[in-house]
Amino acid sequence: MNETPRVRKPASERRAEIMQAADAEFAANGLAGTRIEAIAARVGVSHPRIVQMFGSKRSLFMEVMHATFDRIEAVFAEAEPTLVGLGDAYRRLLRSERTVGLVMLQAYAAAADEAVREEARRRQLDLQESIARLTGADGLQVRTFFATGLVMTVSDLLELPEQRADAAWSAWILERAAPPDGD
């Protein structure tokens, strides 16, 4: 029997593949519902290999969560430094990378786990500080922006009819997060 020998991939490449598979699995099933075996099967590695690389399912989930926050921070850093500019960039990210919104919601859903809650809280606060720094927004404006972002995330993921059919609705929501003229 002639079997094709498996080609060993560099650890960094394998790690990236596992992160991509974990992103999809955690987005779909959350921390509690995801099985490491499902991630391993997507990549063609063993369960022990994933544990060897990441330590635990929770650690892998937190790395995926951090990567999601990093993607949001990266699009904000490149966006027009206004609340509307950041909101537009976030909406484009949600639509181009569906797992972003799903992983964020799964992170909030996993907040009963103290370690996840602490990391999600820290990253959320860091993101709020970044928004204030980038835009000059005050605390109320940042909180309004986050509330608006959560509405956008849920609306986009649920494909609410008014979200899809009425672009003016999105513009109206983003306007609510914009600072008043003259500030």
Locate each region found by the language model.
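Actinobacteria-biased recognition of intrinsically disordered, low-complexity terminal regions
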Residues: M1-E13, L174-D183
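Short, amphipathic alpha-helix enriched in basic
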Residues: M1-P5, S12-A38
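The short coil/loop that forms the "turn" connecting the two helices of the helix-turn-helix
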Residues: E13-R14, V45, S56
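Alpha-helical structural segments
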Residues: E17-A24, A28, R42, Q52, ...
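Key DNA-contact positions within bacterial/archaeal DNA-binding proteins
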Residues: P48
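Residue-level recognition of oxygen-bearing side chains
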Residues: S56-S59, T99
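Helical hydrophobic small-molecule/effector-binding pocket
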Residues: V75, L83-L105, A110-E118
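Hydrophobic/aromatic-rich alpha-helical bundle segments in the mid-to-C-terminal region
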Residues: D113-L125, I131-D183
